[in-house]
Structures are given as C-alpha cells and as structure tokens.
Amino acid sequence: MRYLTAGESHGPQLTTIIEGVPAGLYITKEDIDYELQRRQKGHGRGRRMQIEKDQARITSGVRHGRSLGSPIALVVENNDWKHWTKIMGSEPITAEEESEMKRQISRPRPGHADLNGAIKYGHRDMRNVLERSSARETTVRVAAGAVAKKILSQLGIQVAGHVLEIGGVKAEKTNYESIENLKKVTEESPVRCYDEEAGRKMMDAIDEAKANGDSIGGIVEVIVEGVPVGVGSYVHYDRKLDSKLAAAVLSINAFKGVEFGIGFEAARKNGSEVHDEIIWDEEKGYTRATNRLGGLEGGMTTGMPIVVRGVMKPIPTLYKPLKSVDIETKEPFTASIERSDSCAVPAASVVAEAVVAWEIANAIVEQFGVDQMDRIAENVEKMRKLAREF
C-alpha cells in the first residue's frame, strides 16, 4: 500500500489518495472522523483547533461501508480557508497586488523549514514553504492511519499511543493492566498520559511555557499488540520492519529521535540485561520472558508487543521569538510569529499511532499479499497457527 497527501495549511482542503487497500475492508466516515477528532484534542493546542472541525469526505474507493480495492480518496476541508482565499488563492495576481499582500514572510523561524526551503525552491515569500511544511498536513496522515488501523483491527491487532513525558515531567506509572485499559485512561486525559498525577504536572508545565511565550516537547510511546511472528524481514535493510517504523516516526513534524523497547538504555547495560530469553508456552507457543527489545528482532516481529517511542522537540514557532535575519534586508530581527500550539505532544501521540499502524498494516498486506481482506485474515491466522505448532 502507499498514500500521497496534498494541500496547504491555509488552503481550501487537504487530500490523501490511498492505493493498495484490500477489497472488503469495513471502513466508514465515522471511523476516520473519530481519529481526526482525537488529533485535535490535547492541552496546549492553539486557536486553530477552535476553528477547524476536521471531518473526512470519502470521495472514492469505498461503497456501502466496504473498500472496493480501488484507490481510496479522502478530503478534509479547512474551515479557515475563507479568511485566506486571496492570500492562498491559486489564480495569478498582479505585481501591485503581491506587493500589497499581507502576511508575506521574510523572517525565517529558527528550527523550522522556512529558510532552507526558501533557498531550495527559490521562494522570496517563505509562506510558500511554511504552508506545506506545517503539521496541519498530519491531518490526512491520521486519516490514512485510520484506514490502516481498521485493517489491523479486523486482524485482531490493537494499537495504542500515549504520552510518557512533557517538558521534563515524566510519567512514573506506566505499568498498564491491558492495552484496553491504557486506551481508556489516556482517552480521558487532556495530555493523553496514563499517569494522572504526572498528567496534571504536564499541564502545569504547558501553561507555564505558554505564559512565557515559549513551547515544550516530550516523548510519546506507541504499543501494538497481536502482530504475528515474522512480519518484516532480515534479508535486506529496506525490508526490516524496525527501519520502516523508525523512518515513519521520524517523518512526523518536529520528531528528532526514536527507540524500541528499552532503546538507548541498552547502551548502558550488559547483553544479559538486554536480550529477551525465549520460553515455550503450551497455549502461546514460543514467547519471551521479557520484552526489552520491543517486539522486534532481526528486523522482524517476535509476537511480543511492539513498543516504539518518539522524541518531539518543542514547536519552533514562539510567541517570544528567537533572533533571525530578514532575507530582504539581511538585518537582524526577531523571527516571524505564526499562530501555533505551545505543546502538541498529546496530538503527536495520535499521529505516531497513525504512522506506526500504517507501516505495520502495509507490511502485513505485503507479506500476506492478496487483494481481499478476508483472505488476508485467513493467511494471518495460518501464520499464527504455524508459529504455535513450530
């Protein structure tokens, strides 16, 4: 499977076209809208989320609630477009109109794509860069992820994302009873944190950063349960599932690090404290005594829960902006200010869920590759049975 997205942050709409979804997948507009609404929530979101009421329009590839096997096209309209029709319109304008146009940007923001993108594409107005590099694009990535999560759900695979850390405040309570309980608790948390006390402190940290005109980042974790053994491959670098997951997580706006299982902590431990001992269980078959490697060995799944974490840096748009240089005058100035969040880590956990779900669903569809959803489900069950009886 693959998908492409199109659209600017303040353009008329965002679009994604998804190719390769098996026929017979049960998917509705409500399934996608539910994920879009989750992305919009979270303590620390900016005023833009008060304007947008993200809902998907399915324009192809689904009939009567089931996928057809043809490309699925999804559209999410931008409510804010009505305020930007002239500034972001596609029709040509005169030189006089361009010189009078408001909201042109010549002062790049440190940490953003503004300056590098302007140099690369030759844009004197850096709005041409920031409109596409904006995290608003993740709206339709979450929509694509919603389709992937439906594939996984119909194969008995569950995905849950939550927040482990914001602004230096760490969740101490992380031993959730079940993935269902993890979902229940985090959906009720304004910061999507399983540890309620830590969640309150995270909210205080976000409020303090906002009051100071600053922003803060954090760490999110995605857990996937029910993936059969052997998804991925050790044969080539580009078929290793952990490499695909790492690339997907790092492709999320502002993400600068990724780890699996105990992650970088493995560098400070002996091998006997890192690797997961193999045991035999009468019901499960081969399993592991621990899950320090996060459900992945040799580029393949082990049957244990997949555990992926991503590090999100603070958002680079600051209401107390850093020093920059005006590209027209070359004079020092403070950077431009765009309406933004003070912390988007809770929402980013939903985006991380989406991209992780996509990569796993894609690997399963590729590995058990047939064009019908029910036949893929049959093949996945055969693999589970084979692993138990091996």
From Swiss-Prot:
Which cysteine pairs make disulfide bonds? none
Q: Which InterPro entries match?
A: Chorismate_synth (IPR000453), Chorismate_synth_AroC_sf (IPR035904), Chorismate_synthase_CS (IPR020541)
Q: Which GO MF term does the entry hold, naming one? A: FMN binding
Family note: Belongs to the chorismate synthase family.
Recorded catalytic activity of this chain's protein? 5-O-(1-carboxyvinyl)-3-phosphoshikimate = chorismate + phosphate
Q: How is the cofactor bound?
A: Reduced FMN (FMNH(2)).
How it assembles, according to the record, is: Homotetramer.
Q: Which UniProt keywords apply?
A: Amino-acid biosynthesis, Aromatic amino acid biosynthesis, FAD, Flavoprotein, FMN, Lyase, NADP
Please report the name of this protein according to its UniProt entry.
Answer: Chorismate synthase
Q: What is its EC number?
A: 4.2.3.5
Which parts of the sequence bind FMN?
132-134, 253-254, 298, 313-317, 339
Function of the protein? This reaction introduces a second double bond into the aromatic ring system.
- Organism of provenance: Bacillus licheniformis (strain ATCC 14580 / DSM 13 / JCM 2505 / CCUG 7422 / NBRC 12200 / NCIMB 9375 / NCTC 10341 / NRRL NRS-1264 / Gibson 46)
Q: Single GO cellular component annotation? A: cytosol
* Pfam families assigned to the protein according to its UniProt record, in alphabetical order: Chorismate_synt
Please indicate which superkingdom the organism of origin belongs to: Bacteria
SUPFAM superfamilies, per this entry? Chorismate synthase, AroC
Per UniProt, NADP(+) binds at 39, 45
Per the UniProt entry, what is one GO biological process?
aromatic amino acid family biosynthetic process
Q: Which cofactor does it need?
A: FMNH2
> HAMAP family, per this entry?
Chorismate_synth
Is this entry keyworded Lyase? yes
